[in-house]
Amino acid sequence: MRWANILLVAGLCRASLGQYNEEEDLAWLQYYMRQSRMSSYNYMPYYEDENSPYVYSYVPAPDTEAEPVPEAQQASSWQCPQECDCPPNFSSAMYCDTRNLRYLPFVPTRMKYVYFQNNQITAIQEGAFDNATELEWLALHNNQISSEKMGKRVFAKLKNLERLYMNNNNLTKMPSPLPRSLRELHLSYNQISKVPSNALEGLENLTALYLSHNYIFEMGASLKGLKSLILADLSYNHLRKVPDGLPMALEQLYLEYNYINAIPDDYFKVSPKLLYVRMSHNSLTNQGLSTNTFNSSSILELDLSYNRLQKIPRVSTNLENLYLQGNQINEFSISSFCTVVDVMNYSRLQVLRLDGNEIKRNAMPPDAPLCLRRATVIEI
């Protein structure tokens, strides 16, 4: 107020000397009043009581009257919960990670990227995200969230959600329903035992599915309708059979560390873009494979190490890396790589690992150098 009085006197003095100009001389007063309004706002904590995390709005006491707040200040009053950080230069992001939170703070409407990872959150109540329907990126990994304490339709209204991170929690069931907009789903390191056929229904935009390190023993046909899926990581589970049907767009399939002992005929033919197949540490035998199971022209890398194979399975001449170490292979069959061996017909194989088998170094046939002329590493 002191500076206001000085400025006011200065302005009046100037006017009395006949130097008054309405446009110029009222500008300083308008500026001061604007500054006064802006600086008078008191930044109160979002929550009145930290023990009531789901009381989303502040209600004044009955015997008091809420002081009117300018519109611009009302917008900023819900800008960020006190438990989190909302960078001014990234106004659509809210960082609440690594703060020992036991509950989900309120998510303001405009938020698109929200990070709750590395906390002790155990539950997600129904409607927790109903106010934040613009969310695109939701990080909930490394918490203690259980399926029993999660709302049945907690993600259903998030029509713009593209990435959901829930790995490293205590989930025993697949969260469902999930929004069709989803592109990445991270559910590794949970306790999920089954993926129902309709669990991923309608997720036509899903490109990456991470379900490793669970207790899944059955996948059914849950992958079949995922027409955009590029990567499926189902490693470190309890699968005894491969999923029923693969998506056409699939490029990477990880099934290592399961109990799979057989693969149906032409299983990989339905995925013409498949590049990487990893099935190490399973129970595969030659009896459980057809002659051309892995003879797919698109596959570039095939890992069948640490299984129960006794013979080298037939592979495509386009294959570049083949890992067969730790099996029971006792013969080197060149027909597994080249059906015809001559100058024009040869394998593109660059890396071949056969160490840890029953095969001997002198078992390599004389025409092997011609067939495997591209190989830079052959370990026996």
From Swiss-Prot:
Membrane spanning residue stretches: none
Post-translational modification: Binds keratan sulfate chains.
One of the record's GO cellular component terms: extracellular space
A Pfam entry, by short name: LRRNT
Annotated signal peptide: 1-18
Classification via SMART domains: LRR_BAC, LRR_SD22, LRR_TYP, LRRNT
Glycosylation sites: N89, N131, N170, N205, N295, N345
Location relative to the cell: Secreted, Extracellular space, Extracellular matrix
Predominant subcellular localization, coarse grouping: secreted
Listed InterPro entries: Leu-rich_rpt, Leu-rich_rpt_typical-subtyp, LRR_dom_sf, LRRNT, SLRP
LRR repeats: from-to residues: 110-131, 134-147, 160-180, 181-202, 205-227, 228-248, 249-270, 273-293, 298-317, 318-339, 348-371
Keywords from the named record: Disulfide bond, Extracellular matrix, Glycoprotein, Leucine-rich repeat, Proteoglycan, Repeat, Secreted, Signal
Sequence similarity: Belongs to the small leucine-rich proteoglycan (SLRP) family. SLRP class II subfamily.
Subunit (UniProt): Binds to type I and type II collagen.
Protein name: Fibromodulin
Native source species: Gallus gallus (Chicken)
Gene: FMOD
